[in-house]
Amino acid sequence: MNLPARVRVTRPPLPLAPALKAAAGRLCPDAPEALTGAALAIAGGGVIGAHLRWDGGEAANVETGWRGRGIEEALAQAVSG
């Protein structure tokens, strides 16, 4: 999948480190503490997208300026795989 040059998608280990947890919580505020999966999009050292999964649900969000560039799809693929 082609992403913008500055963007990388990663599956960090769980539980998320405090800084990643705060950034993911900003993007997906309804996500619970206990996650079963997470994929984050990073650009310029900051989290610009998150796809979080937990027992009984999931949430995804990408910062407005980065939407429509394939990041949503890359996050969904990463959290599933």
Residue ranges and their predicted role:
Residues 54-55:
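A generic structural motif
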Residues 1-33, 38:
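Short amphipathic alpha-helix that is part of the acyltransferase structural core
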Residues 59-71:
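A short, internal acetyl-CoA/4′-phosphopantetheine-binding micro-motif in the GNAT/acyltransferase core
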Residues 68-81:
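Conserved acetyl-CoA-binding loop-helix of GNAT-fold acetyltransferases
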Residues 6-8, 46, 78:
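Detector for intrinsically disordered, low-structure N-terminal pre-sequences
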Residues 34-51:
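Conserved beta-hairpin
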